Amino acid sequence: DNKFKVSGLIFGEVWIKPLEEKFDLDIDVSLKNGKYMDEPFDEMIISLLYKNDMLHIDDISMTKQGSMGMQINGIIPTKKDSKSKKNIIIESNFSNLSLEFIHRFIPDFFKIDGRANGFLKIGGTAKKTTFKYDLNIKDAMFDAIKLGNIKSIGEYNGKYLLVKEVVSSTNNNNIFGKGRVPIDFNISSTNMGSFFKSDSITFLTKGHLEKLSFLSPYISDLDSLKGDINISLNLNGPMSNIDKSGKISIANG
């Protein structure tokens, strides 16, 4: 699994204490000039303790001087017990984090790219994971669409990604979206990053544009369409058979 592969010059200590059917693990290491999931870094720090079926993350951080930084800390219960009520508590802050790097963890999701700043707070359980996020993204790309600068806030409830707001601004084109997407982001899932195809999406997008060049990857003739343009697009229905509707009005075209 590539998620557990990391390269670089390593310094530090790893302490393991075998028990009857368990073990305690204490890791305090630093890696220099390496790669993780094909993302280069100047330094990665891993400081964590595994004991009594709990993973305590003091610090997992990855930095590339002048261009990227990411830090994670918290607690993850690892015991596979349906009666366990111990929750995940994870917080992450990041700056100039590559969304292409994030996409490698969820390859079945739409292609995404750009540089993200913000935070992510994860809770719930491994079986039913929840999180909240607040993101600002530069030079964003979703699928084949260039979206410029994006701000988005939302949360995940174990079944739906609830996008409270996503705002895109590029070249005097402004787009607003909100809705819910049925997708599996549960940590213990073997299908993490896949859509729940039997569940329904509800997503509304509105925009005020000067031209429709952002849609030209799909319909090339739209690239030359200019004016005072208002659009609305709706996605509804099961992921296996999405109903798409919308309207466009153009003035001074």
Question: Can you say where each PLM-predicted feature lies in the sequence?
Answer:
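Interface amphipathic segments
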Residues: D1-F119, K127-G253
